[in-house]
């Protein structure tokens, strides 16, 4: 068969996930109160992630709430670890370069991997790998404007086979605000992890900061990881982690995933890669509802980049849309996939 194929490891995972998903497609189960999709996760895989002692001092963990830029951060760090050389990101699928801690094929259950290991997690802090907190392993938490997260997660739920149908835009927004979506409440997630700020081995950075100054953000990440880069290598990291470069790289754009996991007919996994797209989707009423819940939930916390831009006009990198009635969260999108 022509073209690159998923590795055998992923084929094994696909078979296991598909078998479970066919039995309870679109169903969630709860692990310690948090909803998880059946198939990709099991109580056993979550317990392994939480309780394993298989943590090394030079491990690197990327932690995010879903649809907050996980894959963008993976690409950046993979390039940093290779001094800007794009060979790795062009030859190995992104999910294998940075496996997940909590999935049915867990990063902790894979054959021995060389250090430094790069791993990802969507887990809230109370379910995260306990051994990491007593180690020197580095944790990078990437946050994103929750309004954009809602839009991206809504569209992703339409193409990810193992997720519940999102229902109407209004239903999905209400479920998101109540934490009745995969991995639970965004508010609880970020409030839990933000407490780690100030620890030497913890870096909090946002999707918006990456967009506003990718080069400066990469330099900050390099400093945190103790891996300084020269100007040429730094420029290579910035160039090869740009959204257009990732979207063109079939090792990073998820086009290798089979239809049993991702319905490519419904849209692309990497959708727009911008900040502020929620303004093209939220109605005035939805925006007001969201703002009220946000103020109540985030009271007393430091401000974030999206707080300063919430009242700005157009999304970053976009021209001001022509004035027309807001179509709401489910506006027709020519490419309704998911942001990074």
Swiss-Prot record:
It catalyses: an alcohol + 3'-phosphoadenylyl sulfate = an alkyl sulfate + adenosine 3',5'-bisphosphate + H(+); pregnenolone + 3'-phosphoadenylyl sulfate = pregnenolone sulfate + adenosine 3',5'-bisphosphate + H(+); 3beta-hydroxyandrost-5-en-17-one + 3'-phosphoadenylyl sulfate = dehydroepiandrosterone 3-sulfate + adenosine 3',5'-bisphosphate + H(+); cholesterol + 3'-phosphoadenylyl sulfate = cholesterol sulfate + adenosine 3',5'-bisphosphate + H(+). GO terms for biological process: 3'-phosphoadenosine 5'-phosphosulfate metabolic process; cholesterol metabolic process; negative regulation of cell population proliferation; positive regulation of epidermal cell differentiation; steroid metabolic process; sulfate assimilation; sulfation. InterPro entries: P-loop_NTPase, Sulfotransferase_dom. 3'-phosphoadenylyl sulfate binds at residues 67-72, 144, 152, 207, 241-246, 271-273. Its EC number is 2.8.2.2. Isoform 1 is expressed in skin and testis. Higher level of isoform 2 expressed in skin and intestine, moderate level in the kidney, low level in liver, stomach and placenta. Residues 301-340 are annotated as: Disordered. One of its GO terms (cellular component) is nucleus. It comes from the Eukaryota. Keywords: Cytoplasm, Endoplasmic reticulum, Lipid metabolism, Microsome, Nucleus, Steroid metabolism, Transferase. SUPFAM superfamilies: P-loop containing nucleoside triphosphate hydrolases (SSF52540). It is found in: Cytoplasm, Cytosol; Microsome; Nucleus. Substrate binds at residues 95, 100. Sulfotransferase that utilizes 3'-phospho-5'-adenylyl sulfate (PAPS) as sulfonate donor to catalyze the sulfate conjugation. Sulfonation increases the water solubility of most compounds, and therefore their renal excretion, but it can also result in bioactivation to form active metabolites. Sulfonates cholesterol. Catalyzes sulfation of the 3beta-hydroxyl groups of steroids, such as, pregnenolone and dehydroepiandrosterone (DHEA). Conjugates efficiently cholesterol but has a greater affinity for pregnenolone sulfation. Does not show high activity with DHEA. This is Sulfotransferase 2B1.
């Amino acid at each position: 068969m022509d073209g690159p194929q998923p590795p055998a490891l992923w084929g094994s995972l696909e078979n296991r996930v598909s078998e479970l998903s066919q039995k309870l497609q679109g169903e969630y189960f709860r692990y310690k109160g948090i909803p998880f999709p059946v198939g990709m996760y099991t109580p056993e895989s979550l317990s392994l992630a939480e309780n394993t002692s298989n943590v090394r001092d030079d491990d690197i963990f990327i932690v995010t709430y879903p649809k907050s830029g996980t894959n963008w951060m993976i690409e950046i760090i993979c390039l940093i670890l290779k001094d800007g050389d794009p060979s790795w990101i062009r030859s190995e699928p992104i999910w294998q370069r940075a496996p997940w801690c909590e999935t049915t094929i867990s990063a902790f259950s894979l054959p021995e991997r060389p250090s430094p290991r790069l791993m990802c997690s969507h887990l809230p802090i109370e379910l995260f790998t306990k051994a990491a907190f007593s180690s020197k392993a580095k944790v990078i938490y990437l946050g994103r404007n929750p309004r954009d997260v809602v839009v991206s997660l809504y569209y992703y739920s339409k193409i990810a086979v193992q997720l519940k149908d999102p229902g109407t835009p209004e239903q999905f927004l209400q479920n998101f605000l109540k934490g009745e979506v995969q991995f639970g409440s965004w508010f609880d997630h970020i409030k839990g992890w933000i407490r780690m700020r100030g620890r030497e081995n913890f870096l909090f950075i946002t999707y918006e900061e990456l967009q506003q100054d990718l080069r400066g953000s990469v330099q900050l990440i390099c400093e945190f990881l103790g891996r300084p880069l020269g100007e040429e290598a730094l420029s290579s990291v910035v160039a090869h982690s740009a959204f257009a470069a990732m979207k063109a790289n079939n090792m990073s754009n998820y086009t290798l995933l089979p239809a049993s996991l991702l319905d490519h007919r419904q849209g692309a996994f990497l959708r727009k890669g911008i900040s502020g797209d929620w303004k093209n989707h939220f109605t005035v009423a939805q925006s007001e509802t969201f703002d009220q819940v946000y103020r109540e939930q985030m009271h007393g916390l430091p401000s974030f980049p999206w707080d300063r831009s919430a009242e700005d006009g157009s999304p970053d990198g976009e021209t001001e849309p022509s004035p027309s009635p807001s179509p709401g969260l489910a506006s027709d999108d020519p490419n309704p996939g998911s942001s990074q």
